[in-house]
């Protein structure tokens, strides 16, 4: 059986020789855990021998409302404009947006039905009146039937890859320094709601998050929440004014 030093040597090899990120090292050690626990049926976990490296928690780069509007204004293709606007306006994952059907758009109740979201759970999200107008204009032009956003293959929805590629040209035209992807539009949806005063518990079901902590993570990014909190430095008494320097004796 592998010992502590064997695992340590392997981990150092992955980090220093292979130059793997902490997430990739997690995967490698998880494979070892599976091999021992499942294949060999031995109760052993790498983290009991050696602590797993911590994954760096990077905050996503958030587009401002003006940047979102500018980017979407650069999307010339009607279908691409409609689906990317849907990702932002409804806060959908790209995997959810491509699976939408025309019948999922409920203009009577002003909601969008999301079937089999992450975790295979259905949910409803808000339908913006402005989004409804864009979708209606798109529908009049395309007349989609089975899928709201059909792909190049008959009977299949547009692929996630195609939607990702649809961001490339508009991003170049927009000259935005920040990266833009379908998922960054979802990030922007969350942060803009928080900055507008929406409650985390209200946003959680819209995103389809199981845990409130996942949604609360975005509070670290909502800048108005940070800026609205006064620094304790402002509470310190101001120092007495410094007296002006004395006038030189001869001039």
UniProtKB/Swiss-Prot annotation:
<feature type="active site">
    <location>
        <position position="93"/>
    </location>
</feature>
<dbReference type="GO" id="GO:0006310">
    <property type="term" value="P:DNA recombination"/>
</dbReference>
<dbReference type="GO" id="GO:0075713">
    <property type="term" value="P:establishment of integrated proviral latency"/>
</dbReference>
<feature type="active site">
    <location>
        <position position="118"/>
    </location>
</feature>
<feature type="active site" description="O-(3'-phospho-DNA)-tyrosine intermediate">
    <location>
        <position position="218"/>
    </location>
</feature>
<dbReference type="GO" id="GO:0046718">
    <property type="term" value="P:symbiont entry into host cell"/>
</dbReference>
<keyword id="KW-0614">Plasmid</keyword>
<feature type="domain" description="Tyr recombinase">
    <location>
        <begin position="58"/>
        <end position="231"/>
    </location>
</feature>
<dbReference type="InterPro" id="IPR044068">
    <property type="entry name" value="CB"/>
</dbReference>
<dbReference type="InterPro" id="IPR002104">
    <property type="entry name" value="Integrase_catalytic"/>
</dbReference>
<feature type="active site">
    <location>
        <position position="186"/>
    </location>
</feature>
<dbReference type="GO" id="GO:0003677">
    <property type="term" value="F:DNA binding"/>
</dbReference>
<dbReference type="GO" id="GO:0044826">
    <property type="term" value="P:viral genome integration into host DNA"/>
</dbReference>
<feature type="domain" description="Core-binding (CB)">
    <location>
        <begin position="1"/>
        <end position="40"/>
    </location>
</feature>
<keyword id="KW-0229">DNA integration</keyword>
<comment type="similarity">
    <text>Belongs to the 'phage' integrase family.</text>
</comment>
<keyword id="KW-0233">DNA recombination</keyword>
<feature type="active site">
    <location>
        <position position="183"/>
    </location>
</feature>
<keyword id="KW-1179">Viral genome integration</keyword>
<protein>
    <recommendedName>
        <fullName>Putative integrase/recombinase y4eF</fullName>
    </recommendedName>
</protein>
<dbReference type="Pfam" id="PF13495">
    <property type="entry name" value="Phage_int_SAM_4"/>
</dbReference>
<dbReference type="Pfam" id="PF00589">
    <property type="entry name" value="Phage_integrase"/>
</dbReference>
<dbReference type="InterPro" id="IPR013762">
    <property type="entry name" value="Integrase-like_cat_sf"/>
</dbReference>
<dbReference type="GO" id="GO:0015074">
    <property type="term" value="P:DNA integration"/>
</dbReference>
<dbReference type="InterPro" id="IPR004107">
    <property type="entry name" value="Integrase_SAM-like_N"/>
</dbReference>
<keyword id="KW-1160">Virus entry into host cell</keyword>
<keyword id="KW-0238">DNA-binding</keyword>
<dbReference type="InterPro" id="IPR011010">
    <property type="entry name" value="DNA_brk_join_enz"/>
</dbReference>
<keyword id="KW-0814">Transposable element</keyword>
<dbReference type="InterPro" id="IPR010998">
    <property type="entry name" value="Integrase_recombinase_N"/>
</dbReference>
<dbReference type="InterPro" id="IPR050090">
    <property type="entry name" value="Tyrosine_recombinase_XerCD"/>
</dbReference>
<feature type="active site">
    <location>
        <position position="209"/>
    </location>
</feature>
